[in-house]
């Protein structure tokens, strides 16, 4: 949002300096990004006067100008078409640097003629993106003085960042109201002259969708002269970057910037019949799409036959769908409501009769249409942040008065209106105790009431309670915390006393969870993984490859068509990154992300998802090199699981839970703890890779951190690490068991069979085939045996083998393979 100091002073009586105003704006939440002072930047450029002009003897397109300056007469070579005798211009003397191009003016000879300066255009001074000639100043400009005050540039420009909830601050009047509440000045009372209508408009108004357009007003004005706007208006608009077109259009822009109420002026002679506000091409009930979410999710993706064209003011043509709110007459579309007008009914220099519109439209519909067509206009920007419906008719009156004062006293109709003002909001019970509780600010009820009244709130004190009604322009005030924030920002955040924060409970579950996630990240980073952060939304087309789509997970108001669904897993986002990297010939990569995945509307889980692909090490004189495989991934997952106090081998789940369809059916597994599914790891299915245009193997793991047991931190002395001095023995066993038995469960059982002797159990083979009975598999393990107090004898080893075989037989109905 841009505005100038003089514009602010139209509504605020203040003697505060630019610096004081800027500091106050930032303090009340209207962050000042920049203060532009063109007068300071262009102070060396002065007013000059062209006394005589003649053609250049050696160049048809150049002219020799005799220029009067404060230091005397100069000859300047100029090629501008509008250069002529008798006009005041902007002079850059020798030694001055031109902003556009950053070059210094030197005395030069151009095609044999001396030139002692430069006559400047708006483009050269960075006052416009393009210009057709040199700047022409008003006749009252004094030769030798700085030109900025004659060109309206001696007016500092404030550039503020307005948050989406503060639609009321998109008008200079709203900003002035906040500054007055802060004590920077006194808010001027708006003086709106009563308009005497001279006729009743025959133009009928039909609003078919009151929810989409809660208020639409217009006034017909006849016999106007659409002449150029006065200097004060043109300067204001030019300083904030708005192109001046004609007085009729300039007034609507002025009202939009002054009060945050978008307006539009139609050429009344081009409007046929009445005005209708409706959703374009409403579908019949037998064709209606079932479910609002389904409509939102699919409307933008599917081609439609019932489309019409809007030839917009920006010169572009748009195809409309039934989701677009339009303004139309008998001849067709006359505008995309709240976004942009139609070129065919726009005002021109010859326009004498207008229809002046001031309306309020559904913010979500305006945002959706603007986003779908990628149209960014001041009207859209304000409409999608909600308009003060109770000020709309006042804005229409102010605009009407201004047009009549500039364009002549034309004939004015009565206001044509459909819709009503917004009803008063429900009061909220606020108190000084509540304010102190959540902000630490100690104020009495009278001080609280004074601040709120300055901001336009309606208050009623009942003892210790103050009933507060938010003003119509503050759509964001809905709860007590909002009121507390309003008081705090006007009172001053810098005045809130600082207090010492309470000591953190080191055994707090949230703190331990945060530390654990941080450790997971460090572990993977140490293994060469790069952390990424991706959007929690994704395309429903991608999502259906990874999970069954659920209606409640579609976004009603997506940021873009490609982000219309809440992600069921992080994996698609990582695969998209892999695909983009491969397109740039980057083949070796390892990524991870910690973030939410959404199962349904009530179930959200935090996942650690990692992905590797490419070469583990490259070919070199000492090695042929090899690519990543699933065991590399498993090793990295084991490090993470070990920190969480788990063993991956013990957590491999084969209890009948189906593997997600996006994993390779025989090269991936589920991991779990009891009946609790913790995630999956393995190779990604080739069909998924083909969809993402990935031509190399991808390995990934997903770990549900939410379901991971949070092991309480152990404090105290660790057990002493002891190494046996006696010889270790190794024995290989191959057991035949049923296919339904989990390998991890068998390994875990063997590990715990005799903890005094067993030091390690390593799985080295799994076999199933013709040499085994149907429904059976062979599991081969290497067991390291070692006692702490003696060397194991053959008797000890044979006894161990006998007991182990018997235990496997009893527990898993397994037999020793011959």
Swiss-Prot record:
GO CC annotations on file: phenylalanine-tRNA ligase complex
Required co-factor(s) are: Mg(2+)
Name where it's found: Cytoplasm
Annotated positions binding Mg(2+)? 476, 482, 485-486
Q: What's one GO MF term for it?
A: phenylalanine-tRNA ligase activity
Q: What does the UniProt cofactor note say?
A: Binds 2 magnesium ions per tetramer.
- EC number, as in UniProt: 6.1.1.20
Report the residue ranges that make up the FDX-ACB domain in this protein: 724-817
Q: Which keywords belong to this entry? A: Aminoacyl-tRNA synthetase, ATP-binding, Cytoplasm, Ligase, Magnesium, Metal-binding, Nucleotide-binding, Protein biosynthesis, RNA-binding, tRNA-binding
User: What's one GO BP annotation on this UniProt entry?
Assistant: phenylalanyl-tRNA aminoacylation
Q: Where is the B5 domain?
A: 423-498
Q: What is its main location?
A: cytoplasm
Q: CDD domains attached here?
A: PheRS_beta_core, tRNA_bind_bactPheRS
* Cited SMART domains: B3_4 (SM00873), B5 (SM00874), FDX-ACB (SM00896)
Q: Name one Pfam family in it.
A: tRNA_synthFbeta
SUPFAM superfamilies of this UniProt entry? Anticodon-binding domain of PheRS, Class II aaRS and biotin synthetases, Nucleic acid-binding proteins, PheT/TilS domain, Putative DNA-binding domain
Q: Which residues form the tRNA-binding domain?
A: 39-148
Q: Write out the similarity annotation.
A: Belongs to the phenylalanyl-tRNA synthetase beta subunit family. Type 1 subfamily.
Assembly notes: Tetramer of two alpha and two beta subunits.
UniProt protein name: Phenylalanine--tRNA ligase beta subunit
Report the source organism.
Rickettsia conorii (strain ATCC VR-613 / Malish 7)
């Amino acid at each position: 949002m841009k505005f100038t100091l003089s514009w602010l002073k139209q509504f605020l009586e203040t003697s505060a300096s630019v610096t004081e105003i800027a500091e106050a704006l930032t303090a009340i939440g209207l962050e000042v990004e920049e203060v532009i002072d063109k007068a300071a930047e262009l102070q060396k450029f002065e007013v000059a006067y062209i006394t005589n002009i003649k053609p250049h003897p050696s160049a048809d397109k150049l002219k020799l100008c005799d220029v009067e300056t404060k230091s005397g007469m100069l000859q300047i070579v100029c090629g501008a078409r509008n250069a002529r005798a008798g006009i005041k211009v902007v002079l850059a003397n020798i030694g001055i640097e031109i902003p556009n191009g950053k070059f210094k003016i030197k005395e030069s000879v151009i095609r044999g003629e001396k030139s002692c300066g430069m006559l400047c255009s708006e483009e050269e001074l960075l006052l416009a993106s393009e210009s057709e000639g040199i700047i022409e100043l008003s006749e009252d400009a004094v030769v030798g003085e700085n030109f900025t005050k004659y060109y309206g540039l001696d007016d500092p420009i404030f550039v503020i960042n307005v948050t989406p909830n503060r639609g009321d601050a998109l008008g200079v009047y709203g900003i002035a109201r906040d500054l007055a509440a802060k004590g920077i000045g006194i808010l001027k009372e708006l003086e709106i002259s009563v308009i005497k209508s001279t006729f009743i408009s025959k133009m009928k108004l039909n609003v078919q969708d009151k929810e989409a357009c809660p208020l639409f007003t217009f006034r017909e004005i006849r016999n106007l002269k659409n002449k150029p706007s006065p200097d004060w208006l043109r300067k204001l608009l030019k300083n904030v970057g708005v192109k001046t077109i004609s007085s009729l259009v300039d007034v609507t822009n002025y009202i939009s910037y002054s009060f945050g109420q978008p307006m539009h002026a139609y050429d009344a002679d081009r409007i046929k019949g009445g005005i209708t506000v409706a959703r374009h091409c409403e579908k019949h009930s037998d064709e209606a799409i079932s479910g609002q979410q389904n409509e939102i999710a699919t409307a933008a993706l599917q081609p439609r036959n019932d489309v019409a064209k809007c030839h917009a003011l920006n010169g572009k043509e748009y195809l409309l769908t039934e989701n677009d709110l339009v303004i139309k007459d008998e001849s067709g579309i006359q505008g995309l409501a709240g976004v942009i007008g139609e070129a065919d009914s726009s005002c021109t220099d010859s326009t004498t009769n207008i229809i002046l519109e001031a309306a309020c439209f559904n913010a979500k519909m305006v945002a959706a249409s603007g986003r779908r067509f990628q149209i960014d206009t001041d009207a859209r920007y304000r409409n999608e942040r909600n308009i003060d419906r109770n000020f709309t008719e006042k804005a229409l009156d102010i605009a009407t008065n201004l047009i009549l004062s500039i364009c002549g006293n034309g004939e004015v109709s009565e206001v044509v209106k459909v819709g009503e003002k917004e009803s008063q909001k429900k009061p909220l019970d606020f108190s000084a105790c509540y304010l102190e509780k959540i902000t630490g600010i100690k104020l009495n009820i009278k001080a609280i009431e004074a601040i709120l009244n300055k901001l336009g709130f309606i208050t009623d004190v009942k003892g210790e309670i103050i009933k507060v009604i938010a003003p119509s322009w503050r759509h964001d005030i809905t709860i007590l915390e909002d009121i507390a924030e309003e008081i705090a920002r006007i009172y001053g955040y810098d005045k809130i006393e600082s207090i010492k924060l309470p000591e953190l409970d080191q055994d707090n579950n949230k703190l331990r969870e945060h530390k654990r996630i941080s450790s997971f990240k460090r572990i993977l980073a140490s293994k060469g993984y790069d952390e990424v952060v991706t959007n929690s939304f994704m395309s429903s087309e991608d999502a259906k490859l990874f999970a069954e789509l659920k209606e409640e997970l579609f976004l009603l108001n997506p940021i873009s068509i490609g982000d219309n669904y809440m992600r069921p897993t992080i994996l698609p986002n990582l695969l998209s990154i892999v695909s983009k990297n491969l397109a740039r010939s980057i083949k070796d990569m390892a990524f991870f992300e910690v973030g939410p995945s959404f199962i349904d509307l009530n179930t959200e889980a935090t996942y650690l998802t990692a992905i590797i692909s490419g070469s583990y090490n490259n070919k070199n004189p000492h090695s042929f090199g090899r690519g990543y495989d699933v065991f590399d991934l498993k090793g990295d997952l084991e490090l993470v699981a070990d920190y969480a106090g788990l063993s991956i081998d013990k957590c491999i789940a084969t209890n009948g839970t189906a593997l997600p369809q996006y994993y390779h059916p025989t090269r991936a597994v589920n991991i779990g703890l009891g009946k609790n599914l913790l995630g999956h790891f393995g190779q990604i299915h080739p069909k998924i890779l083909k969809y993402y245009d990935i031509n190399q193997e991808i390995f990934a793991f997903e770990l549900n951190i939410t379901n991971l047991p949070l092991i309480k931190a152990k404090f105290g002395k660790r057990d002493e690490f002891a190494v046996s001095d006696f010889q270790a023995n190794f024995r290989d066993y191959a057991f035949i068991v049923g296919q339904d038995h989990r390998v991890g469960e068998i390994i875990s059982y063997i590990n715990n069979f005799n903890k005094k002797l067993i030091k390690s159990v390593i799985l080295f083979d799994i076999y199933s085939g013709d040499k085994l009975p149907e429904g059976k598999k062979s599991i081969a393990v290497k067991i390291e045996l070692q006692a702490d107090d003696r060397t194991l004898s053959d008797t000890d080893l044979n006894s161990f083998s006998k007991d182990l075989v018997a235990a496997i037989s009893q527990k898993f109905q397994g037999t020793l393979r011959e």
